Amino acid sequence: MFPRPLTPLAAPKSAETLGRTPRRAPLGRARAGLGGPPLLLPSMLMFAVIVASSGLLLMIERGILSEMKPLPLHPPSHKGAAWSGTDPKPRGLSLDAGDSDLQVREDIRNRTLRAVCGQPGMPRDPWDLPVGQRRTLLRHILVSDRYRFLYCYVPKVACSNWKRVLKVLAGILNNVDVRLKMDHRSDLVFLADLRPEEIRYRLQHYFKFLFVRDPLERLLSAYRNKFGEIREYQQRYGAEIVRRYRAGAGPSPAGDDVTFPEFLRYLVDEDPEHMNEHWMPVYHLCQPCAVHYDFVGSYERLEADANQVLEWVRAPPHVRFPARQAWYRPASPESLHYHLCNVPRALLQDVLPKYILDFSLFAYPLPNVTKEACHQ
């Protein structure tokens, strides 16, 4: 059997338009006006915070927040029928007796999705989105027509390896060797490449999935990678961040020594809808209200979840998701905890609302940075 589909409840649309708060223009380009419906998400943020808080209270009651390490977002792997275009849409999985905490998280995620996505004015499909949001979404959904699935890629959540897998399934690559340099655009098909009627057909009939990660852990991973290793990001973003937020910075900083708090201050001033994809919230990248995903995998169970997806879509047995290399040192809950304990509390409180939908919709606990927790 498949996991329970993440399908929002239907609700009547509202003609009411909601206002937007002006934001600082993103680095490196001017802000342009967007056509289409009014942008609704910023006005829904307070509602999302309330919903997230109610979900977190339930998690506290069950004792889930006492552990720093996030639990998987869905039941452990189960054998079942693989996906094909004629199969019925996935339905729920039964849980074993020891999976009560897991059930709580899944229930919170589905309840929050229904509550947030069921609000009047929230999008029901990609054509309910403003033009700019729809463009971002369609540019992040990869298509496999041979295996009839759609994958919304999220940077810093193993998307490079998923792109390798898609190229192997399409016959472009012979294997998923992670030592090969990855071209992130060529030989890949995105929903944005298709006509509207082709997009609608695939959204209705294909298996749809994405993978998520603790939002702050994802930010730390992006910070370490982009500002610690990639000169282009240091020059394009790092230099301006230093000029903005570091007292006494010269007129031409190198941008190769951005601190994590400086990066977070930059995020506070950015409009989430126009962020770089490596730190744009998953909600804006994949629009889980506008696209009804059949499965949400987690970075914490990456290899097992990914191989389960490959089984569902009937990928050849020799195609397996690449194992993490022994030399790779990802941002971990422990390293995140260390960095967050050195971030001013007020700054963290300003950053969290930008990602509150990612925390609440995907059942990730908010960070514990109390004095007691930080001195353990």
Swiss-Prot record:
GO terms for biological process: carbohydrate biosynthetic process; dermatan sulfate proteoglycan biosynthetic process; dermatan sulfate proteoglycan metabolic process. It is a single-pass type II membrane protein. Its main location: Golgi. GO terms for molecular function: dermatan 4-sulfotransferase activity. Keywords: Carbohydrate metabolism, Glycoprotein, Golgi apparatus, Membrane, Signal-anchor, Transferase, Transmembrane, Transmembrane helix. Residues 18-30 have a biased composition (Low complexity). Glycans are attached at residues 110, 368. It is found in: Golgi apparatus membrane. Disulfide bonds: none annotated. It catalyses: dermatan + n 3'-phosphoadenylyl sulfate = dermatan 4'-sulfate + n adenosine 3',5'-bisphosphate + n H(+). Residues 1-39 are cytoplasmic. Residues 1-30, 76-96 are annotated as: Disordered. GO terms for cellular component: Golgi membrane. InterPro entries: Carb_sulfotrans_8-10, Sulfotransferase. Its EC number is 2.8.2.35. Residues 61-376 are lumenal. The chain crosses the membrane at residues 40-60. It is an enzyme of class 2 (transferase). 3'-phosphoadenylyl sulfate binds at residues 155-161, 213-221. Belongs to the sulfotransferase 2 family. Catalyzes the transfer of sulfate to position 4 of the N-acetylgalactosamine (GalNAc) residue of dermatan sulfate. Plays a pivotal role in the formation of 4-0-sulfated IdoA blocks in dermatan sulfate. Transfers sulfate more efficiently to GalNAc residues in -IdoUA-GalNAc-IdoUA- than in -GlcUA-GalNAc-GlcUA-sequences. Has preference for partially desulfated dermatan sulfate. This is Carbohydrate sulfotransferase 14. The lineage of its organism: Eukaryota, Metazoa, Chordata, Craniata, Vertebrata.
